[in-house]
From Swiss-Prot:
Organism whose genome encodes this protein: Rattus norvegicus (Rat)
Subunit structure: Interacts with GLRB. Heteropentamer composed of GLRA2 and GLRB; functional GLRB-GLRA2 heteropentamers contain four GLRA2 subunits and one GLRB subunit, although alternative subunit composition cannot be excluded. Homopentamer (in vitro). Both homopentamers and heteropentamers form functional ion channels, but their characteristics are subtly different.
Taxonomic lineage: Eukaryota, Metazoa, Chordata, Craniata, Vertebrata
Positions bound to strychnine: R99
Protein name as catalogued: Glycine receptor subunit alpha-2
Highest taxon of source: Eukaryota
Binding site for glycine 2: R99, S163
Length: 452
């Protein structure tokens, strides 16, 4: 009886044991078919600690592939805004998303079901990151409203995506010879600060390396679609460092400068020509008009240079302002010439009267020299063959001067002729200058810039 009871208990134990093994096998098979893993029971915190925490053995101070091939970091930027191009300081301001991607095999995982993990920005201190900086940066700031504008994403294969939002003020050396019809090329250089090319290499993303927000406009420039991508590897005493760059081509719009500089100065020049139609006797009016236009043109020229740097070469706007000032000043000098010529008849008559007076004095002196009336000889010097010979002056008296009104009319006509010629010569000369000016800067030099 006891042996029979033992056999029954043994059979029941074997049955339950077999059932338990079957259940475990079934659960494993079911989990494998459903994509679940036994480690799913790990909490996210435990998983991250195991992946990059203290228990993982991950060291953020050591780059991937340590003492091996360099880490290839792929970069691309998305431009949110582009503006504040300043000529005086020669820089520009831009707001971008900077995205860097690299592979860190130490962060590869297979225990977690998700293909990628979006981590909190605070985890950035726990992983290795490239030491990227902007070589031509003059000022920059991060954004933390309402939270840090940073993104960290890790894929199963160990690929890391690091995105950050930045506002940068970058240096942009400008050539202002054609200002304000110029095309500027501004660069953005991304360089490694610590790691040489033996450890780190930057590359542009093959698909869409530089993206621009839709509808992005600049107040004074047109941002051209073509952007030059290239390498700018730097050689220092400390080694050779990786560097990539993008060049933005900015074409200046002339609308503002036409309204503020070109059209006002053109009108001032035309206003100075009104003097040619004012009577030459109206000296106060013509002088006041000439001086006013000269001073206004000088102020306009100074204002055009106020917002520009002090460069050693001549700009297109400088040539325009200088020629306009020259035309205005020439119009003032033209009236000085007209006034001088119109008053020359007075000087001419004054010289005639002086010459006549001098001639009379000479005649009187000459007559008194040969007058012997005190000795009863009168005007007779000698008698030859019964004929008395009178003393005659050596130089005959000059012809009587022309009528004063005729002389005045002659000089006034000359002055009027100067005004008449100026009415046509000044506009014609200014028109010729405009033709050469606009052809040179809008066509010839513009094409040269595009060829470069």
């Amino acid at each position: 009886m006891n042996r029979q009871l033992v056999n029954i208990l043994t059979a029941l134990f074997a049955f339950f044991l077999g059932t338990n093994h079957f259940r475990e096998a079934f659960c494993k098979d079911h989990d494998s078919r459903s994509g679940k893993h036994p480690s799913q029971t790990l909490s996210p915190s435990d998983f991250l600690d195991k992946l990059m925490g203290r228990t993982s053995g991950y060291d953020a101070r050591i780059r991937p592939n340590f003492k091996g091939p360099p880490v290839n970091v792929t970069c691309n930027i998305f431009i949110n805004s582009f503006g504040s191009v300043t000529e005086t300081t020669m820089d520009y301001r831009v707001n971008i998303f900077l995205r860097q991607q690299w592979n860190d095999s130490r962060l590869a995982y297979s225990e977690y079901p998700d293909d990628s993990l979006d981590l909190d920005p605070s985890m950035l201190d726990s992983i290795w990151k490239p030491d990227l900086f902007f070589a031509n940066e003059k000022g920059a700031n991060f954004h933390d409203v309402t939270t840090d504008n940073k993104l960290l994403r890790i894929s199963k294969n160990g690929k890391v995506l690091y995105s950050i939002r930045l506002t940068l003020t970058l240096s942009c050396p400008m050539d202002l010879k054609n200002f304000p019809m110029d095309v500027q090329t501004c660069t953005m250089q991304l360089e490694s600060f610590e790691y040489t090319m033996n450890d780190l290499i930057f590359e542009w993303l093959s698909d869409g390396p530089v993206q621009v927000a839709e509808g992005l406009t600049l107040p004074q420039f047109i941002l051209k679609e073509e952007k030059e991508l290239g390498y700018c590897t730097k050689h220092y005493n400390t080694g050779k460092f990786t560097c990539i760059e993008v060049k933005f081509h900015l074409e200046r719009q002339m609308g503002y400068y036409l309204i503020q500089m070109y059209i006002p100065s053109l009108l001032i020049v035309i206003l100075s020509w009104v003097s040619f139609w004012i009577n030459m006797d109206a000296a106060p009016a013509r002088v006041a008009l000439g001086i006013t236009t000269v001073l206004t043109m000088t102020t306009q020229s100074s204002g055009s240079r106020a917002s520009l740097p002090k460069v050693s070469y001549v700009k297109a706007i400088d040539i325009w302002m200088a020629v306009c000032l020259l035309f205005v000043f020439a119009a003032l000098l033209e009236y000085a010439a007209v006034n001088f010529v119109s008053r020359q008849h007075k000087e001419f008559l004054r010289l005639r009267r002086r010459q006549k007076r001098q001639n009379k004095e000479e005649d009187v002196t000459r007559e008194s020299r040969f007058n012997f009336s005190g000795y009863g000889m009168g005007h007779c010097l000698q008698v030859k063959d019964g004929t008395a010979v009178k003393a005659t002056p050596a130089n005959p008296l000059p012809q009587p001067p022309k009528d004063a009104d005729a002389i005045k009319k002659k000089f006034v006509d000359r002055a009027k002729r100067i005004d008449t010629i100026s009415r046509a010569a000044f506009p014609l000369a200014f028109l010729i200058f405009n033709i050469f000016y606009w052809i040179t800067y809008k066509i010839i030099r513009h094409e040269d810039v595009h060829k470069k």
